[in-house]
């Protein structure tokens, strides 16, 4: 669910400076506050509720699954709770983050559909995180975690949706995803077809045919292969070519070629380019260190210092 809504709905700026804390620190703090809130919700509260929904298309089946942070009954209405930890000022927060709300709405729709509900409640709960460097904040009280209460430590947003409203919203979300998924399907179909009759682009050198066969068989058998060979035998093409052919046979979807030096990276790029000239349809990217790629003197991935960070997610989702 999270991957789906982030892929379709994520917008705004790229900002790695938010809060100034490390990702690992935030995850640990987030786990603590999740558990605090869940334990204080009462005996009827269900935590970490697994939900699964499948929709069949012509060429594939979409399986949407995830875990709702919590669920409880409020009178005749079932409420799905999504808990998010944050370092931002909660007192100035006027509404939930759209991507966070979308995640909870997906859970609400799936549960409502499967349990024939007429309406569903969605409770977004934001709570202030503390870093290990700051020291832990005192535990939240039972009174503070009540949905009707909000303060500088915790903020709640409760909304109720009719199931037809959720259904229309969810269908539009999947329709947006389908455009990309169908494109991916057709691309992979064309890619795999181009690999079926791909031939080794050069006459084989001594030992090269054995290396190509060894790499290919190793991938098919899901084993590991360690090779020591002299310079000039053509190791790069002899490993890239059979790996790509194996992808065409359904043995994988991506190929990672790791290098320690720029020159070996360049040789790998040239190998893929040569195969493309022979008819291969294949997308290849080179991952380069941020420090080498950045247009700034010092990498600062935030909308204030970097024009490329400003509106980054608006552009990639356009």
PLM region descriptions:
Residues 216-217, 236-251, 271-275:
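Walker A/P-loop NTP-binding motif
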Residues 53-166, 239:
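Mg2+/Mn2+-dependent nuclease catalytic core
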Residues 220-242, 254:
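Walker A/P-loop
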Residues 1-77, 102:
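Metal-dependent nuclease catalytic cores that hydrolyze phosphodiester bonds in DNA/RNA
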Residues 184-228:
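Conserved pre-motif I regulatory segment
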Residues 164-197:
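Charged, low-complexity
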Residues 184-193, 198-199, 251-318:
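A substrate-engagement module of RecA-like helicase motors
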């Amino acid at each position: 669910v999270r991957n789906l809504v982030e892929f379709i709905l994520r917008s705004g700026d790229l900002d790695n400076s938010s809060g100034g804390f490390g990702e690992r620190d935030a995850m640990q703090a987030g786990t603590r506050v999740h558990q605090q809130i869940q334990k204080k919700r009462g005996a009827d509260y269900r935590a970490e509720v697994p939900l699964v929904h499948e929709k069949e298309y012509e060429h594939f089946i979409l399986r949407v699954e995830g875990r709702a942070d919590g669920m409880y009954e409020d009178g005749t209405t079932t409420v799905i709770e999504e808990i998010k930890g944050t370092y931002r000022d909660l007192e100035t927060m006027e509404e939930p983050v759209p991507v966070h709300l979308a995640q909870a709405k997906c859970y609400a729709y799936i549960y409502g559909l499967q349990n024939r509900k007429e309406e569903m409640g969605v409770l977004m709960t934001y709570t202030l995180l503390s870093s290990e460097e700051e020291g832990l904040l005192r535990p939240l009280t039972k009174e503070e975690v009540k949905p009707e209460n909000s303060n500088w430590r915790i903020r709640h947003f409760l909304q109720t949706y009719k199931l037809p409203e959720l259904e229309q919203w969810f269908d539009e979300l999947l329709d947006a995803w389908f455009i990309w998924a169908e494109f991916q399907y057709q691309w992979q179909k064309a890619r795999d077809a181009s690999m079926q009759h791909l031939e080794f682009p050069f006459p084989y050198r001594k030992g090269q045919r054995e290396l190509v066969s060894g790499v290919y068989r190793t991938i098919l058998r899901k084993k590991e292969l360690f090779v020591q060979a002299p310079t000039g035998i053509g190791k790069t093409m002899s490993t890239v070519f059979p790996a790509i052919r194996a992808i065409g046979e359904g043995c994988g979807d991506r190929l990672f070629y790791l290098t320690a030096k720029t020159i070996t990276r360049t040789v790998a790029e040239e190998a893929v380019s040569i195969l493309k000239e022979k008819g291969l349809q294949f997308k290849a990217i080179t991952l380069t260190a941020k420090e080498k790629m950045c247009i700034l003197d010092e990498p600062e991935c935030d909308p204030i210092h970097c024009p490329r960070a400003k509106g980054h997610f608006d552009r990639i989702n356009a």
